[in-house]
Amino acid sequence: MANIDIAGIMKDLPNDGRIPKTKIVCTLGPSSRTVPMLEKLLRAGMNVARFNFSHGTHEYHQETLDNLKIAMQNTQILCAVMLDTKGPEIRTGFLTDGKPIQLKEGQEITVSTDYTIKGNEEMISMSYKKLVMDLKPGNTILCADGTITLTVLSCDPPSGTVRCRCENTATLGERKNVNLPGVVVDLPTLTEKDKEDILEWGVPNNIDMIALSFVRKGSDLVNVRKVLGPHAKRIQLMSKVENQEGVINFDEILRETDSFMVARGDLGMEIPVEKIFLAQKMMIYKCNLAGKAVVTATQMLESMIKSPAPTRAEATDVANAVLDGTDCVMLSGESAAGAYPELAVKIMSRICIEAESSLDNEAIFKEMIRCTPLPMSPLESLASSAVRTANKARAKLIVVLTRGGSTAKLVAKYRPAVPILSVVVPVLTTDSFDWSISDETPARHSLVYRGLIPLLGEGSAKATDSESTEVILEAALKSAVTRGLCKPGDAVVALHRIGSASVIKICVVK
């Protein structure tokens, strides 16, 4: 960190229309699915729209997505679409007359794997068939977001029941979620419902990324790519590690995944609550070193579901995630079902800008270089050199001309102090044409990387490679000036290819 002094705390940041480098993911729901509200969220700073398939039908989500497309068209703001799978869940069963039951501390209760029974104070059911085989006396069962703790006393496989003691007094409703901390659960990462959601809704709708719930090992991602088949190339996989098994296998998951989500909700039931900060820092640090985008999620501005201002702890939590190195911060209930979705995005955006202004980007750059094994790949060497050049020349912007977006993502890995304009260049096929992007996918994929601003440009391309590059670069700089990213007289670092050679150059904005 840098720039920490009393004057820095007292002075306001200049109100020059700056946008945060950190990206904002918003979960869409009842509070945020109309066209006017989606336009407000896009203008406030939403970069990724999350569709949570734990709730809602395909028709419901389709209506929301159609509205989002209209809002994007109206505002001319690009937004990526994320499908978040429900994943393999264990839930408690239905209750007699549908009424919640009262559990008392010290009372014993039987848990059955027969999901057809209607539960009461003596017996409840759970949806996991192998519960009796996987649990042993002394294990813990957490129900309803951890509000109820049951300790296993004995297991009876023939009858399919587990005898438990209740450790606290609480009320249990129907179909509440269940966690089994430390137990290796034999459930597929991709359930039949998930496959249906992805193949029947996600693929036809050209979604950009899938957030996979409860990823436990690297092979889970290999299997999901098999399910996606030919679509695996254009849909990014974002892994959510939500249990101990996933934490233990973190390195192999990171190798296989495209990006990552620190989903602190379920993880907080699986590991002690006082260790969550440690897991968050470890995951973000490793993602940063691997150059893979990471999203920090769950309860970031939770109180804003009902209140127009976040708690001090929440504001600090968002800022600390930025200081840890997260690429994106996420809103869940705040934007999906809260009373102040637009305000939540605006406040989150302001906190991110403030946190970013206190970062020591040069120290981060040096740490990245120190931790990257040699020899670097030619592309990585180029990307890091572009950032070093921008830091030394005090450039105001880095412009990257890229085909698939991977060069721009590598530049983002080295965390320059300035924004990165990622211009996705179409492949030249004819002598001259109006260049516009045939496929926006690479541009939308870059919306989860800190500091990356994708540009979909139009202009005319000349016959030769170097001439066309100059035209594209000129158009990109014009667009950057219009957006307020730089002004005439500023130095800008450009990174692009000419033929088979890669070039880094410093241009002065005209």
Swiss-Prot record:
In its keyword annotation, does this UniProt entry include Metal-binding? yes
Where does the record place it?
A: Cytoplasm
Q: Does the keyword Chaperone apply?
A: no
Q: Which UniProt keywords apply?
A: ATP-binding, Cytoplasm, Glycolysis, Kinase, Magnesium, Metal-binding, Nucleotide-binding, Potassium, Pyruvate, Transferase
- According to its UniProt record, which reaction does this protein catalyse? pyruvate + ATP = phosphoenolpyruvate + ADP + H(+)
Q: Please give one Gene Ontology molecular function term for this protein.
A: magnesium ion binding
Question: What pathway does the UniProt record associate with this protein?
Answer: Carbohydrate degradation; glycolysis; pyruvate from D-glyceraldehyde 3-phosphate: step 5/5
What InterPro entries does the record tag this protein with? Pyr_Knase, Pyrv/PenolPyrv_kinase-like_dom, Pyrv_kinase-like_dom_sf, Pyrv_Knase-like_insert_dom_sf, Pyrv_Knase_AS, Pyrv_Knase_brl, Pyrv_Knase_C, Pyrv_Knase_C_sf
Spell out the residues of the site Transition state stabilizer. Answer: 240
Principal localization reads: cytoplasm
* The protein's Enzyme Commission number: 2.7.1.40
Q: What is this protein called?
A: Pyruvate kinase, cytosolic isozyme
Species whose genome carries this gene: Solanum tuberosum (Potato)
- Cite the source lineage: Eukaryota, Viridiplantae, Streptophyta, Embryophyta, Tracheophyta
